[in-house]
Swiss-Prot record:
It comes from the Eukaryota. Coiled coil: none annotated. Residues 312-360 are annotated as: PDF region 2. GO terms for biological process: DNA replication. It comes from Arabidopsis thaliana. The gene is OSB2. This is Protein OSB2, chloroplastic.
C-alpha cells in the first residue's frame, strides 16, 4: 500500500457512476461501467514538445548515508507467481439466493399501500442511510407484496429502523410505486424491526452471506419470537424446524381444500412469515418428518365439517332414510347418497375415513334411484 500511495494517480468513472460524466474535463471519458487506474508517472510518456520524457535518476548516496530498510511486505506479494494463487472455489447455483440482499436502514417515507383490481396487494417505501455527511447518503426503494404488504402498511412507520431481505431487481414497480431517479429496487421477502439498543456498526449495511461468514457472525440461539431476527430465507426454514410450535401447518388443509391452493404450507403464528414447500431447499424436506405442528382450521370449515359428520352418522345408523346411488351413477358429479326427506347429498370422496367400513352394502339395481 505504501508504494501505491506514493504514485500520482487519478480514477475516471463511467456515466454508470456519474450521470454527468460528459462534463468532466480531466482525462478521457470511459463509456463502459468500469473504473480504470492511470499513473501519471508512467514510463515512456511524452512531454509537451513531443520529445520522449526521460526518467530522472536519483543521486547516488554515499555508503555512510545509506540506512538499512526492512523489506516491505508488499514486495513479497508482488513476487508471488500466478501458479501460487489458488483458483476460487465453485459452488452450486441456487436461484433462490441469486441477487439476494440484506438491508438495514431507516424508513425514509411513509409506506404507500395499494390493492389492485386483481386482488393483489402492494406496498412500497424507501430505506435510507443516515449519515452525518450528506454526500455519502443514499436510499433504495423497497417493495412488498401480498400479506407482507398489509403487514408493512399496518406496522411500519417513517423513521423506523428495519431489516429487510429479498431479491434485488431493476424493473418498473407496480402502479403508483415509482420513485424518481431510481430503477434499482428490492422485492422484500422478510421484514423485521431492529431493537433500539442492539449495536450496529453503521446505520446502513449491505452484507452478503459470504461476508457474514468471514466477519464471524454466527447464528444466535433460539430466543423468544419477538426477539428473533431472520436474516436470510433459509433461516426461516431453520426457525421452522427448530421451533415447530411457533408455526401453523396448513399442508393438510390444502389437501382437503380448506384453504386455497396457493395458501402457504407454513405460516408463523405472528403472521410475519410464510413458507411454501415448492420453494424449500432440498435439505428441508427430510427434516420435516417427525415434527409436530399445530394445525389451524378455518372456523367456517369446522362448522361445515361437524355438520357433515352428523350426516354420515345418520347414514350409517339409518340407511333406509337415504337413497343409495353408488351402483349406477350416470353423472360422475352426482351424489352417492341423498336423503329421502331433506334432499341432503353426500359424496364418498368427501367422507371421513371411518365411514367406508361402516357403510351398508350396495343395494340392488332395481332398489336404487338415479339422478
Amino acid at each position: 500500500m505504501s508504494l501505491i500511495s506514493k504514485s500520482l494517480a487519478r480514477i475516471e468513472c463511467s456515466p454508470f457512476f456519474y450521470p454527468r460524466a460528459s462534463e468532466i474535463t480531466t482525462g478521457k471519458r470511459i463509456t463502459s461501467p468500469q473504473i480504470r487506474l492511470y499513473t501519471a508517472a508512467a514510463v515512456g510518456g511524452k512531454t509537451g514538445n513531443g520529445e520522449r520524457k526521460q526518467r530522472a535518476k536519483a543521486p547516488a548516496k554515499t555508503p555512510e548515508a545509506v540506512t538499512p530498510v526492512k523489506p516491505l511486505e508488499i514486495a513479497s506479494v508482488t513476487a508471488t507467481t500466478e501458479n501460487e494463487l489458488p483458483r476460487p472455489n465453485e459452488i452450486a447455483y441456487e436461484s433462490e439466493v441469486a441477487n439476494w440482499v440484506n438491508l438495514i436502514g431507516f424508513v425514509d417515507q411513509p409506506v404507500q399501500f395499494e390493492a389492485s383490481s386483481d386482488g393483489k396487494f402492494w406496498a412500497g417505501t424507501v430505506i435510507s442511510q443516515r449519515s452525518a455527511s450528506d454526500s455519502s447518503g443514499f436510499w433504495i426503494p423497497i417493495i412488498f407484496e401480498g400479506d407482507l404488504a398489509k403487514t408493512a402498511a399496518r406496522y411500519v412507520s417513517k423513521d423506523d429502523q428495519i431489516h429487510v431481505s429479498g431479491k434485488l431487481f431493476i424493473d418498473s414497480p407496480p402502479p403508483n410505486m415509482t420513485y424518481a431517479q431510481a430503477n434499482v429496487q428490492v422485492l422484500v421477502q422478510n421484514l423485521n424491526f431492529i431493537q433500539p439498543m442492539s449495536p450496529s456498526p453503521s446505520p446502513f449495511m449491505v452484507m452478503s452471506s459470504s461476508e457474514k461468514e468471514e466477519s464471524g457472525i454466527k447464528k444466535q440461539p433460539a430466543r423468544a419470537k419477538q426477539d428473533i431476527v431472520i436474516d436470510e430465507a433459509s433461516d426461516s426454514w431453520n426457525h421452522l424446524i427448530e421451533n415447530p410450535k411457533e408455526w401453523w401447518d396448513h399442508r393438510e388443509n390444502k389437501v382437503n381444500g380448506l384453504v386455497k391452493p396457493r395458501h402457504p404450507d407454513f405460516k408463523s403464528k405472528d403472521s410475519s412469515f410464510s413458507l411454501w414447500l415448492n420453494k424449500a431447499p432440498n435439505w428441508v424436506l427430510p427434516k420435516l418428518e417427525g415434527l409436530e405442528f399445530d394445525v389451524l382450521v378455518p372456523k367456517a370449515r369446522v362448522v361445515k365439517q361437524l355438520k357433515g359428520e352428523e350426516s354420515w352418522k345418520d347414514l350409517v345408523q339409518n340407511p333406509d332414510k337415504w337413497w343409495d346411488n353408488r351402483i349406477d351413477k350416470r353423472n360422475a358429479k352426482a351424489p352417492d347418497f341423498k336423503h329421502k326427506e331433506t334432499g341432503e347429498a353426500l359424496w364418498l370422496n368427501e367422507s371421513p375415513t371411518w365411514v367406508l367400513p361402516k357403510l351398508p352394502p350396495v343395494k340392488k339395481k332395481q332398489e336404487s334411484i338415479v339422478f
